[in-house]
Amino acid sequence: DHIVSPHGFSYTSASLSPYVYAPYTYAASPYINPASVAVAPVNVATSYHAQDVIGQASYGHVDAYQAHHAVQDAAGNKVGSYSYVSPEGKVVKTNYVADATGFHVASNALPVGPTVVPAPVVDTPEVAAAKAAHLLEVEKVKGRV
């Protein structure tokens, strides 16, 4: 006793009792959400390069999982940075300077040294005795000269 309309409305018939007046009513049909379609992400990559006649340059590239940017002066010195996503999913960021003194880098992926300064090495009793005997001999030789 329920008719679904192709236009998004549904209708109900009047009451079957001859003694009760029931007007026709309508209500919107339930909305059925179509199945979602998975769309692969689009990998957008860009790159740039600009250089003047004396060798100064700015260049780099960016894509979904890595980026690199650098500037170079006329003497060939470079300052730049790059980043990428490691296989573990960590974003690795690196800044660098390359000049006449070498390649200098700062990165969140470099090993970190110990925070506590190690205790000085203490000579064993045998080493201390050998050093004392050696210094005594050195003083004897100095006295002869």
Swiss-Prot record:
Q: Does the keyword Repeat apply?
A: yes
Any one Gene Ontology MF annotation carried by this entry is:
structural constituent of chitin-based larval cuticle
Does the entry feature the keyword Repeat, yes or no? yes
**Keywords tagged on the record:** Cuticle, Repeat
Which part of the chain is the Chitin-binding type R&R domain? Answer: 41-114
Domain of life the protein comes from:
Eukaryota
Listed GO cellular component terms?
Answer: chitin-based extracellular matrix
In Swiss-Prot or TrEMBL terms, this protein is called Cuticle protein 7
- Which species expresses this protein natively? Blaberus craniifer
